[in-house]
Amino acid sequence: MAHKKGVGSSRNGRDSNPKMLGVKRFGGERVKPGMIIVRQRGTKFKPGANVGLGRDYTIYSLIDGVVTFEQHSRNQKRVSVYAAE
């Protein structure tokens, strides 16, 4: 049987760096323009009012205000920022 054995340690050892994805500012939190609200892969959250969508699908605030997460459809969430009173 010509099987290679015992070379596991030299062939293992690959792992990607963490990407720090996820929600950075939650509903009800105050944000300023340019603050990142969500970092994501693809549009898990869709942009709503007063937010921008970056090239890597990062959602960020365009105005001073409060973050809200709204149910857009059955399986879609929308992130908006509304001006604080």
UniProtKB/Swiss-Prot annotation:
Matching PROSITE patterns: RIBOSOMAL_L27
Span list, region Disordered: 1-25
Origin organism lineage: Bacteria, Bacillati, Chloroflexota, Chloroflexia, Chloroflexales
Name of the protein described by the UniProt record: Large ribosomal subunit protein bL27
Keywords per UniProt: Ribonucleoprotein, Ribosomal protein
Underlying gene: rpmA
Source organism of this protein record: Roseiflexus castenholzii (strain DSM 13941 / HLO8)
Example GO biological process: translation
Family: Belongs to the bacterial ribosomal protein bL27 family.
GO molecular function, one term: structural constituent of ribosome
GO-annotated cellular components: cytosolic large ribosomal subunit
Any Pfam family the entry gives: Ribosomal_L27
Keyword Ligase included in the entry's annotation: no
UniProt feature coiled coil, ranges: none
